[in-house]
Amino acid sequence: MVYGIGGAPEGVAAAAAIRALGGDMQARLIPRNEVKGDTEENRKIASEEVQRCEALGVKVNEILKLEDLVRDDNLVFAATGITHSELLKGISRRGNLATTETLLIRGKSRTIRKIQSIHYLDRKDSEIYEILRN
């Protein structure tokens, strides 16, 4: 069972993983001011959210089924651990090497893969290298 509050992108990502594993889910798009508190800033953001939903033909506060979020099994869900969790190991570093663990789930075949990758940091873009160097 999965239960939580998050933004629309997080909801679609969760729906992709759940569908790929043969599960089911429902969701609702709720304006920010109803979830995060009725402040002036949250009302402004909520107004923009509602406008985006209306432009896409999505009704706010309407229950969305899994099929509304992810139309078919032609998908791949991918997640890489940043910090250690029950599901994935976080990034570990030893000198010039960083190790990551990624979960891949293919929807059509329900194939689940865990991939451990070793990254040579001096071969990465300078921005990534600087972040991981410290």
Protein language model features and the residues they cover:
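Helix-rich terminal scaffold detector
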Residues: 1-4
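Anaerobic metallocofactor- and corrinoid-dependent redox/one-carbon enzyme cores
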Residues: 7, 19-134
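Glycine-rich phosphate/ribose-binding loops and adjacent secondary-structure elements
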Residues: 10
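Short glycine/threonine-rich loop/turn motifs
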Residues: 13
